[in-house]
Amino acid sequence: MALLAAATLNPTTHLSLRSRAGRNSENLWLRSAASSQKSKGRFCNLTIRAGTPSKPAEPIGPVFTKLKPWQIPKRDWFDKDFLFGASTSAYQIEGAWNEDGKGPSTWDHFCHTYPERISDRTNGDVAANSYHLYEEDVKALKDMGMKVYRFSIAWSRILPDGTGKVNQAGIDYYNKLINSLIDNDIVPYVTIWHWDTPQALEDKYGGFLNRKIVDDYKQFAEVCFKNFGDRVKNWFTFNEPHTYCCFSYGEGIHAPGRCSPGMDCAVPKGDSLREPYTAGHHILLAHAEAVELFKACYNKHGDSKIGMAFDVMGYEPFQDSFLDDQARERSIDYNLGWFLEPVVRGDYPFSMRSLIGDRLPKFTKEEQEKLASSCDIMGLNYYTSRFSKHIDISSDFTPKLNTDDAYASSETKGSDGNDIGPITGTYWIYMYPKGLTDLLLIMKEKYGNPPIFITENGIADVDSDPTMTDPLDDWKRLDYLQRHISAVKDAIDQGADVRGHFTWGLIDNFEWSLGYSSRFGLVYIDKKDGNKRKLKKSAKWFAKFNSVPKRLLKTTNNNATVTVTSVSV
């Protein structure tokens, strides 16, 4: 989970980008950017389910308005095979940072070395103590009726030095977690890497700034496939690479904390206009190598899927103008397309190639062939949206961060002075469900309608009075989730191939540079009472929502959805 950055382009720079994503756009999944893609239109013939349309909620203004009873989503709006679940990541919940042979990660080092960079000067040493309390997490999932748990593997827990000898205690921990999930009829979806690179590799050669990490990541992925692949059938190679690159190597507010000299970060010895692209390039190469290995050696029966989870922000033009309309397109390119287009067609968006120049690395033909069509499934992490406002390319504006390269600003208020949606408990999340629907339709119309899971979606309570007087009465989170689940249904009704919705997060966790001051969980973690788990109102709603008997849900016959019956929850 993280705040997302904006992006942009001068409309005269690349004329092919003048059409908005949608009915006037070329389908980039079908368009071949290189000869490598002539036989790789994997998602071109997907079946689109028809369904009973949900009743849309009333538009959201600058304040919260209560949903009508018929607008609150029901489980029987969705096919019986649509998956509801929750997500977490290793560093944010596990704790046990140096137990049972685990090596330090970049986040261990960052929090211990630069505690002032965390808003409440905390760290993930204990976090929610899920390393010891994982059975309580599984119980919470079961109590809510969730069918999926998406979690990540701590690289340095199973490979303390990042490569070489495997730590069996780490393997044992994840085996116990996976087995417990399966015993409780919960499907594990595993993220191989969620920002916590082994510090040993950072010290050895600079982590993701060095191409050597591609082979080391491949070894790490193989350890995961070999030890867990008999039970884990759904994998995400990387989580939110866009946010990672921007925050870790651009602004430097996340581990390893690098930025350009003269900027305010932990390690002002980097290059905020070049290093984010270098790290991102190596992430994509590592993804391609891991996918090739997976398909050649660990999916011989074809019953497993692999992909990537992308952070996405919705965008609207700041005002009704050609320039802001194009700014919106560039913002989407820099936010989503940076990592999506390489795994779809084998190269970066045209707008990025035009504006970034030689700071953006190039792929070889062989690398393009490995990257193109390399995702069986895709995850979208959606929280909020912004207005995108054009910035002229001129001597008056000099990019200092990689996010400036897009020549567009992200605005919370439109040209009329109104917020894009109601502000939630977290300063950066404005509720705008339409942004999620729009993005899903872009995936359908521009990118070939790949199978999508909403792998993160939620809001935080701020852990201080008066914002969070009763941590269990999270009515704003409940309203937010209900509206966004409805937004997913709206996209499905328009043909988007969405397969599941996973709330972020299962439990309150260490929220990176915000420490424990922002609580995203469906389940409250009482740190004053041994990290005891307590279901919030939103969790209890999910328990009711998911309680509809399977026999009353929709069934699929001849690729068309038929509603057997309908119940209210």
Curated annotation (Swiss-Prot):
Tissue: Expressed in young seedlings early after germination.
Transit peptide: 1-50
pH dependence of this protein's activity: Optimum pH is 5.5.
Gene Ontology molecular-function annotations: beta-glucosidase activity; DIMBOA glucoside beta-D-glucosidase activity
Transmembrane spans: none
One Pfam family named in its UniProt record: Glyco_hydro_1
InterPro entries cross-referenced by the UniProt entry: Glyco_hydro_1, Glyco_hydro_1_AS, Glyco_hydro_1_N_CS, Glycoside_hydrolase_SF
Residues the record lists as binding a beta-D-glucoside: 92, 194, 239-240, 383, 456, 504, 511-512, 520
EC number(s) per entry: 3.2.1.182, 3.2.1.21
Disulfide bonds: 259-265
Annotated localization: Plastid, Chloroplast
Gene3D superfamilies documented for this protein: Glycosidases (3.20.20.80)
Catalysis performed (reactions): Hydrolysis of terminal, non-reducing beta-D-glucosyl residues with release of beta-D-glucose; DIMBOA beta-D-glucoside + H2O = DIMBOA + D-glucose; DIBOA beta-D-glucoside + H2O = DIBOA + D-glucose
Its job: Acts in defense of young plant parts against pests via the production of hydroxamic acids from hydroxamic acid glucosides. Enzymatic activity is highly correlated with plant growth. The preferred substrate is DIMBOA-beta-D-glucoside.
Other known facts: Wheat is a hexaploid with three different genomes that contains at least four genes coding for GLU1: GLU1A (AC Q1XIR9), GLU1B (AC Q1XH05), GLU1C (AC Q1XH04) and GLU1D (AC D5MTF8). The monomers can aggregate in diverse combinations, reflecting the several isozymes found in the native enzyme described in PubMed:10750901.
Family note: Belongs to the glycosyl hydrolase 1 family.
The protein's name: 4-hydroxy-7-methoxy-3-oxo-3,4-dihydro-2H-1,4-benzoxazin-2-yl glucoside beta-D-glucosidase 1a, chloroplastic
Gene name tied to this protein: GLU1A
